[in-house]
């Protein structure tokens, strides 16, 4: 059989699927990467788990739900490079915050001589991490600047109130330059900011709520952008926030609406 007649279905495990993606591309074989939760909850009650059983469940899922197949399209080289660099940058940013916290949390409880030695070592680590972060940021900016589409998208994103470089960059990466999602609602669901109704059974009197099945990193970034809007003195989104609060809306609900508006504004542009 020709390789093009084969379809490989696998769970999408983020960066760990990269070797499989490369292998399928090299032999020109079609690849379907599915959300692990989608496979899990469509397989009924499960007992026991190992690689052999998991492989069988994935094969059964692919056989039963062939109408849901979505062939994997590899992102552009620029997007892949940005993804890898952003993962590395985020790792260093987390470590940097950790070491900065360690600089002062024990200051009043340690012998002065011991604290000075600790501080000296910490400062060295902090400087190295900051240098690495700056180098990665410069490389990412170079990639964006050399790609007309990405540069234009970055410019449009940063023209929106509350959206800075980090938020704009992560939106571009997560949406793969606005090619991954068909409409803003799908991205809002992915980011965990789209409200859903819960009106059946014991939940029939519940208010609309967001789902916890979300990309928590992009949700956090959108939240920070929305909160920054509330601290602005003026602007279209600030006016929207003030108007809804004056109408008696819950502030957190309005902030969640701002999270959605930030992306729908992006998509509209």
PLM segments and residue spans:
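Short glycine-rich phosphate-binding loop at a beta-alpha junction
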Residues: 5-12
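Short, well-ordered alpha-helical microsegments
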Residues: 16-21
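Long, charge-rich intrinsically disordered scaffolds of nucleic-acid metabolism proteins
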Residues: 36-155
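Short, solvent-exposed helix-loop connector elements
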Residues: 71-84, 111-114, 206-209, 239-256
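Phosphate-backbone recognition surface of nucleic-acid-processing proteins
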Residues: 158-159, 165, 169-247, 251
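Conserved small/polar residues in nucleotide/adenosyl-binding loops
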Residues: 263-269
């Amino acid at each position: 059989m020709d390789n093009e007649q084969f379809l490989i279905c696998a769970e999408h495990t983020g960066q760990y699927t990269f070797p499989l993606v490369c292998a399928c591309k090299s032999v020109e074989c079609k690849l379907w990467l599915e959300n692990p939760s989608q496979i899990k909850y469509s397989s009924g009650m499960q007992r026991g788990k190992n690689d052999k059983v998991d492989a069988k469940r994935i094969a059964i899922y692919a056989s039963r739900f062939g109408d849901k197949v979505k062939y994997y399209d590899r992102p552009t080289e620029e997007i892949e490079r940005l993804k890898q660099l952003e993962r590395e940058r985020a790792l260093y940013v987390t470590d940097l915050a950790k070491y900065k916290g360690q600089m002062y949390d024990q200051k009043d409880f340690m012998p002065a001589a011991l604290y000075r030695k600790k501080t000296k070592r910490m400062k060295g680590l902090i400087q190295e991490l900051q240098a690495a972060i700056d180098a990665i940021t410069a490389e990412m900016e170079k990639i964006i600047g050399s790609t007309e589409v990405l540069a234009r998208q970055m410019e449009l994103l940063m023209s929106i109130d509350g959206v800075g470089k980090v938020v704009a960059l992560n939106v571009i990466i997560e949406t793969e330059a606005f090619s991954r999602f068909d409409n803003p609602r799908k991205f809002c669901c992915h980011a965990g900011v789209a409200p859903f109704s819960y009106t059946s059974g014991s939940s029939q009197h519940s208010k609309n709520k967001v789902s916890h099945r979300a990309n928590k990193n992009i949700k956090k970034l959108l939240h920070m952008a929305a909160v920054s809007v509330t601290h602005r003195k003026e602007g279209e989104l600030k006016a929207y926030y003030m108007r809804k609060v004056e109408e008696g809306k819950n502030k957190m609900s309005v902030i969640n609406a701002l999270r959605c508006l930030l992306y729908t504004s992006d998509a509209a542009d």
